[in-house]
Amino acid sequence: MTSLTNTIGPDVPGPALTTAGGDVPDYFALLKPRVMVLVIFTALVGMVVSQGHVQPAIGAISLLAIAVGAGASGCLNMWWDADIDAVMSRTATRPIPSGRITSEEALGFGLFLSVASVVVLGLAANLLAAALLAFTIVFYAVVYSMWLKRATAQNIVIGGAAGALPPVIGQAVVTGSIGIESLILFAIIFIWTPPHFWALALIKADEYARAGIPMMPNVAGPASTRRQIVWYSLLLAPLGLVPVALGFGGLVYAVVGLVGGLGMVAFSIRVLRNPEGDAERRAAMGMFGFSILYLFALFSALLAEQSFGLFRPVLG
C-alpha cells in the first residue's frame, strides 16, 4: 500500500494554481476530464428518464457539482496511485508521477473539491443527491482506490459501482428519490464495466503485473478472463433491453440495444477465439472500443427519445 505522503518525482515550486508552467491544465488533468464527460452524460440521462421536472438552472448546477465530485474522486485516486502510475506507460505522464504537481497539492485539491461538490449539490438539489455523491466519492477514492484495486481481482467488478451511480444521482436530483429507471441504468453500467476493462487488461497484463495490481488476467489467467468477458456480455445484451420492457425505452432505443447487445456478444466471442499474438491484441482492442460505442449509443438513444420527441413505445 502506498504511503499517505508518497511523492513521485520532484516537487513543483510556486503557487498551486497559476497559468505559468502549465499548472492549470495539470490540475485539470487530475480530474480525469474524459471520465467527467461520461459522468455528466450518464447523470443527464438519469435526469431525463425520471418522472419529474427540475428547473434548468438547478439541473445545470447539479450536473456541474456531480462532474466536479467525480473529478475530485479521480484526483484522490491519482494521489493514492502515484506510485503505480509511475511504472505504467499509459499513466506515467500524469501530473504527479511526472513531477508537475506534488502529492500534497493533489490531496488538498481533491479534498477541497470533494467537499465543495457535495455541499453545492445539497444546496442546489437535495440531501439525497448530495449523500449519493458523497458515497460515490468515498467508495471510489477509499474503498476502490485504497483497498479493492490492490487487494482482489474483483476490483473492477465491485469498484464499478462507483462509475454506475451517476444516473441514480441524476434521478435523485429531479425526484428526490431513487426509482427503477436509474437502478436499471446503474445495472447496465455495472455489468458493462468488467468486459470493458478486462479487454484492456488482457493487453496491459504485463504492466499491471509490474505495478502489482491483481487484474483478472494476472490472477485467473487470460483464458478465464476471456470466458468471463463472454459471460458478462451475454448478461449485458438482454439487460440492455430492460428499459424497453419497463416502458421508458422506445423503438429507437430497442433497435440500438438489440444491435449493440449482439455486437457486444460477437466481439466477446472474437476475444475468446483469438487467444494469442497480434490477433489477441486486435480482438481485445476491438472489444474495448466497441464497448465504449455501445454504452454511448445506448444512453444517447434514451436521451434522444426523451428530449426530442422520438419516443415510440414498443410494448403496449
Swiss-Prot record:
The chain crosses the membrane at residues 35-55, 56-76, 119-139, 156-176, 183-203, 229-246, 250-272, 283-303. The keyword Amino-acid biosynthesis does not apply. It is a multi-pass membrane protein. It is found in: Cell inner membrane. It comes from the Bacteria. GO terms for cellular component: plasma membrane. Its main location: membrane. It catalyses: heme b + (2E,6E)-farnesyl diphosphate + H2O = Fe(II)-heme o + diphosphate. InterPro entries: Protohaem_IX_farnesylTrfase (IPR006369), UbiA_prenyltransferase (IPR000537), UbiA_prenylTrfase_CS (IPR030470), UbiA_sf (IPR044878). Keywords: Cell inner membrane, Cell membrane, Heme biosynthesis, Membrane, Transferase, Transmembrane, Transmembrane helix. Pathway: Porphyrin-containing compound metabolism; heme O biosynthesis; heme O from protoheme: step 1/1. The keyword Transmembrane helix applies. Its EC number is 2.5.1.141. One of its GO terms (molecular function) is protoheme IX farnesyltransferase activity. It is an enzyme of class 2 (transferase). One of its GO terms (biological process) is heme O biosynthetic process. PROSITE patterns: UBIA. Carbon 2 of the heme B porphyrin ring is defined according to the Fischer nomenclature. Converts heme B (protoheme IX) to heme O by substitution of the vinyl group on carbon 2 of heme B porphyrin ring with a hydroxyethyl farnesyl side group. Belongs to the UbiA prenyltransferase family. Protoheme IX farnesyltransferase subfamily. This is Protoheme IX farnesyltransferase. It comes from Methylobacterium radiotolerans (strain ATCC 27329 / DSM 1819 / JCM 2831 / NBRC 15690 / NCIMB 10815 / 0-1).
